[in-house]
Amino acid sequence: MKPKIFYLLINIFFCCVCYAQQAYNVRSPYDPATQKLEAALRGEVLQFTLDNSAIYPGTQREVLVYVPQQYDGSQPACLLVCMDGILYDATTVMDNLIATGEMPVTIGVFVNPGIVYDHSQEVVRYNRCKEFDSTDDTFARFLETEVLPRVEGMQTEQGKTISLSQDPNDRCITGASSGGIAAFSVAWHRPDLFSRVYTSVGTFVAMRGGNNYPAIVRKTEPKPLRIYMQDGWYDVWNPIFGEWFEYNLLMESAFNFAGYEVAHLWDRGNHSIKYGTLAFPDAMRWLWRGYPAKVEKGISNNGMLQTILAEGEDWQEIALAHAPKELFACSDSAAVFAVGNNIYKVSSTGDITESGKLKAGERLLGEGLTTRGSALYRHGQKVAEGLHGLQAAYALSDNRYITLCASNAHSSDKVWVVNAGCRALAIAPDYRYCVTGEAHTHHLISTIIDTAGNMRYSEPFYYLHDLSNGTLQPSGAMAFDTQGNLYVATAMGVQVADHNGRVRAILSLPAGEVQGLAFSGHYLYVLCGERLFVRRMNAVGHIPSEGALTYPSQGQG
């Protein structure tokens, strides 16, 4: 054989081998759940058009609703939500798994992405990427307030009224590609809506911030989620945004680190629905195994979470007759707040007592601290004036104070003044620096305090995480623990930063974004919308009025 022909044949051989390694494995194991049942045993599929969305204005979409043959309407059914319509031949698989008892009686809701048409019915905007790849809670709110209420109360051909369970343990959500990250985002933001998640070739890449999820999962207190992931070694839809498979590996690693129940199927596929369809029956079996036992929170390997959280303790709600807008720490493991002209004190056990009155035009700034006009008062006595635009204040030891003003007020021996256009202020336990908020950025400002109380060397030092897709909601109240870690109220939770300005832990919220925060003794209080919660911590909050204290440095690592 001539050498040229030989080398040509060798090249052809290796090309064929490489192609075969990337080709689909068409000899996938047979799964009986993929076979259609006879017509009498199949579920019914209903359909409606949703074209009046307030959340995604102008969009039109088809929603399909699968009702299994076993559903009799006598009690609420479990729920499966799937993006992009009926994927995975899901209705056939559900027919089979429900019939064999491997899956509970489950209503399927298959939601297509929105499309906006112009006056001539030409597509002017595809909303899929916006809806599915965004990492905020918008799509979760869309499902909760616009899609699922339309499904509730629908009638089947047999006259059965659809009723959906409101228990997240009875709910599963899934999607492929951008629908995969959408499924995860919904459950991540709203574990009160969904506990079980299946992602196929999930787009955890740099589309609209999904590439940030691995770090955030590692830092966030575990949520009660069970997750099944499928992806292929050759999954790269568009390398501009990243390697899909690499980011799925990063997500799985983060889930394992953070203590989640997670399973995966890595195959030889690329960015396709094929293997996601093959994996769907086993994904459903795994996600629903042990049902109706609850999906539980895991235990994270995050050292900061392990240090600051008290084992077995969770948020406890305190009933409020009227919701305050701000919350302040007291020196006896309690917090104070004002509603109207009344000042209330709340204990860690939930007891609320009236503790004082505000004068006309007076605003509460903390325990015993108020402001009226440009003056600062403590226990009704004026301690400073000329503090125009006074936003926040702390009493320190030795009858000193630190204040935050929106004008160019000046410090004195008695009153230290930070000038900034925000309302968030915290002072380190050793009094050597303070932290102020900075609206519409990811940063908090660290300012050194010299021995004369002068503010020096301010810089954007603390970096906060954000999943709001660019709205950059301003951070709220802040507090230090006795080890110098900073707790910050943000839209995505209480973020806990170390001495070097890095967020190491994020505490999950019981309801909505945190608007107020107070840390006293072992008790962390948070105000979420109009609801107040308290949680016993292992960490101890620092009360500035109790004096400065030293704590070990965390070094520069």
State each model region's role.
Residues A321-A334, L358-A375, E385-C405, V415-C434, ...:
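Beta-rich, blade/repeat-based domains predominating
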Residues V295-W315, C405, G453-M455, P544-S545:
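Blade/loop signatures of beta-propeller domains
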Residues A338-G340, G373-S374, L404-S407, A439, ...:
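Short loop/turn segments immediately following the C-termini of beta-strands
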Residues G303-M304, D314-N341:
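Beta-strand-rich domains and repeat architectures in extracellular enzymes and scaffolds
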